[in-house]
């Protein structure tokens, strides 16, 4: 995949109508935004375009309205909050069909530096099917397309891919540019030693990632629920731990592949277990890899955490995707905390691949110590799998 894409700085936007696909899929509680990280992330691109005298038309999805208007998924709260953040009114074009009379009039009346926000793109059923009719309507409002929504870059939708068939200038905003820089370098030309850490519940979610990364990394660390399938593959007992029986054979193949490639594959050597999946369950640390009958693994053990931390400390590039245990339960958060600490203390380029690991790092207060926290869980995973992301591929090459 070519990561060298035109950015907003490579195109002339003065006086032009610029359609910007943002990721404003923010959590709401009674119409109030409870986490505005995604709005903050979009500001540099919007402010740059304002400063250059562009006419800025913002669009985004929110939630899953499944192709029909749902009042609770309206982008009105986003327009209000953005107006405050930009110190400038963001005109909300409230059309159930997204590109309706309100949108057309708002765009027609725009002066250089003005900002309009369209209604939730997923109010239209065509959006997720990437159907021409809606792509054409969106494109008809603008002269230039800018994609700054990395979180949906792995989806071929009207507002991420379809519009580029009708707008010949298509560039990335600052958010996507940053993602391409850090994730692209990690995958293509990492500074070594390159360590990848994979956690989370399921091997099946990470099959292609494990396979692809074994061709690239010096050390691969496995933790979280998926670790128990690997332990079973090595012949250890795992009690009542989460296991994917149909992935045990695959895990054996990956252990062999790591040996062949000379990759240091690190798996748990001790575990924190309990007799039930409960925040109040009493944690017990196992002597070794084996987990007794009636117990389930809920975190990596202290010896494992030490080995993983040491591997991180000697790295020059670290990519982390997925927690080491059930970090929402205090008794089983230590593995995740130790990994986050080791990354925070490291001089390496440290990249967090969105989703649960990003949440964990932010909750633990290590966010500002990481080189880059990806804004897309699914998109960053597909990136690490080596897949081409349609929303990136559709942009102009430099």
From Swiss-Prot:
Compartments, record wording: Cytoplasm
Positions with a binding annotation for ATP: 206, 297, 328, 354-357
Binding positions (substrate): 23-25, 38, 61-64, 122, 155
EC number per UniProt: 2.7.2.3
Biological processes per GO annotation: gluconeogenesis; glycolytic process
Predominant cellular place of this UniProt entry's protein: cytoplasm
Protein name as catalogued: Phosphoglycerate kinase
């Amino acid at each position: 995949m070519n990561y060298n894409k035109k950015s907003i700085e490579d195109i002339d936007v003065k006086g032009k109508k610029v359609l910007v696909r943002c990721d404003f899929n923010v959590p709401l509680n009674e119409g109030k935004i409870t986490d505005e990280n995604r709005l903050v992330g979009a500001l540099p691109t919007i402010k740059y375009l304002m400063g250059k005298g562009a006419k800025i038309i913002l669009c985004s999805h929110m939630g899953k309205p499944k192709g029909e208007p749902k009042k609770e998924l309206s982008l009105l709260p986003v327009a209000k909050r953005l107006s405050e953040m930009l110190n400038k009114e963001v005109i909300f074009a409230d059309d159930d069909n997204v590109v309706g009379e309100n949108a057309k009039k708002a765009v027609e009346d725009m002066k250089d530096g003005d900002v309009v926000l369209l209604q939730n793109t997923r109010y239209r059923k065509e959006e997720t099917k990437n159907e021409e009719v809606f792509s054409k309507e969106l494109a008809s409002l603008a002269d230039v397309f800018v994609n700054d929504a990395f979180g949906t870059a792995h989806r071929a939708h009207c507002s991420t891919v379809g519009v580029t068939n009708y707008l010949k200038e298509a560039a990335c905003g600052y958010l996507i540019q940053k993602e391409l820089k850090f994730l692209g370098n990690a995958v293509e030309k990492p500074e070594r030693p390159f360590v990848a850490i994979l956690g989370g519940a399921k091997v099946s979610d990470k099959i292609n990632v494990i396979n692809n990364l074994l061709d690239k990394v010096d050390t691969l660390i496995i933790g979280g629920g998926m670790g128990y399938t690997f332990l079973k593959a090595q012949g250890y007992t795992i009690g009542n731990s989460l296991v994917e029986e149909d992935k045990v054979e695959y895990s054996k193949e990956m252990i062999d592949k790591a040996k062949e490639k000379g990759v240091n594959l690190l798996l748990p050597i001790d575990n924190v277990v309990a007799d039930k999946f409960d925040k109040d369950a009493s944690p017990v640390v196992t002597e070794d890899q084996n987990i007794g009958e009636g117990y389930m693994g809920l975190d990596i053990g202290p010896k494992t955490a030490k080995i993983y931390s040491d591997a991180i400390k000697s790295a020059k590039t670290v990519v982390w995707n997925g927690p080491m245990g059930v970090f929402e339960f205090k008794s089983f958060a230590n593995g995740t905390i130790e990994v986050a600490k080791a990354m925070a203390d490291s001089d390496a380029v440290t990249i967090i691949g969105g989703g649960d690991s990003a949440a964990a790092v932010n909750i633990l207060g290590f966010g500002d110590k990481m080189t880059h926290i990806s804004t897309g869980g699914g998109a960053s995973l597909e990136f690490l799998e080596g897949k081409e992301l349609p929303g990136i591929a559709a942009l102009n090459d430099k």
